[in-house]
Amino acid sequence: MAQQMPSPEEIAAQLQMIRDQIAELQGVLAQLELRLRSVQAAKETVEKAAGQDGETLFPGDPELNTILKARLLEPGKAIVHLGLNVYAKLDTAKATEILAKKEDALKRSLETLKQELDKLSRTHDQYLQLLQALTAGQAAQQAGQQQKQGS
C-alpha cells in the first residue's frame, strides 16, 4: 500500500510548529549565553580580587556605568552561589574552580542547544522545500486542467 503524501496544509502546520520550536530554543539560547557571560564575569572578578589587599575597584555593572571602590574585609575569600539559594564563603581558588565548572557546564549546554537548533533548521528547510514543490506541482496540475477545459 502506497503512503499518501501529506497535504500542503499539513506541511504548513508542521512548518509552523518547527518555527515555534526554533523561536523557543533561540530564547533559551539567549538566556544561557547571558548566564555564561555572568559566570565568566564573576570568575574574572574573583580572580582579580584574589591578589588584592585593602582597597580595590570593582565594576558596578557589566557595561561599566559604575565602578565601586571597596575594601576587602577578607582578602582571599569569596562568597559563591552553589545553587538552590545556597552560598558559601570559600577561598578564591576554590571559588574560581566552582565558577569554572559552571562555565564549562553552560558551554556544553550551549553547544548541545546549538546542535539541536541546526538540526531543526535543516528540518525546517526540508519541509519548506517539500511545501514549495507540492505547491508548484498543484499549480502546474491546475494549469493543465484549465488548458484541457479550454480545448
From Swiss-Prot:
| Annotated Gene3D superfamilies | 1.10.287.370
Nucleotidyltransferase in keyword set: no
Citing just one GO molecular function, the answer is: unfolded protein binding
Q: What keywords are annotated for this sequence in UniProt?
A: Chaperone, Cytoplasm
Q: Name one GO biological process term.
A: protein folding
Q: Where in the cell is it found?
A: Cytoplasm
> Which coarse location class applies to the principal site listed for this UniProt protein?
cytoplasm
> A Pfam family name for this chain?
Prefoldin
Entry's family note: Belongs to the prefoldin subunit alpha family.
Functional summary from the UniProt entry: Molecular chaperone capable of stabilizing a range of proteins. Seems to fulfill an ATP-independent, HSP70-like function in archaeal de novo protein folding.
| Quaternary organization | Heterohexamer of two alpha and four beta subunits.
Q: What is this protein called?
A: Prefoldin subunit alpha
Query: Which species?
Result: Aeropyrum pernix (strain ATCC 700893 / DSM 11879 / JCM 9820 / NBRC 100138 / K1)
